[in-house]
Amino acid sequence: MSASVSVQIAHPRTLAAVRRQVRIGQVGAAWKPALDKVWEFLRQNPGLHTDGHNIFLYHHPTNREAPMGVDFGVEVSRLFEPSGDIALTTTPAGKVASALHVGPYERMRETHDVIHAWAKANRMTLAGKSWEIYGDPAHDPSKNLTRIEYLLT
């Protein structure tokens, strides 16, 4: 499985999200409790979510050993008042390195690595933020679609 990387222009996506500090490699244990809170909030606020995606927004630290802020969110249709752990946030706008990961979530690291290698080979600088836009889960995990985008400087 080898992803193709392209440069795209990303538009901001508005999210209802819960931010957590997570070490690289521990996202798998943190995402569900955070998203459960977001979905509970959305059920209590009808019309806020119409057809958006689950999106994880990563705020990369300069030290790869440090925890990073991750906004575990759901795309929403309008602005809202934050409540408790639920924050209003947006993905960045601008030029991004973008790749489509096709396959199990457990193998997304491979697509992230392809983007990092592409950036290095093309002398592009990553700007410290990336996000994953999740499609609907497939019955066959090998068919899951997740768009991965890294903001470029």
How would you name each of these model-derived features?
Residues 1-153:
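A solvent-exposed interaction/effector surface
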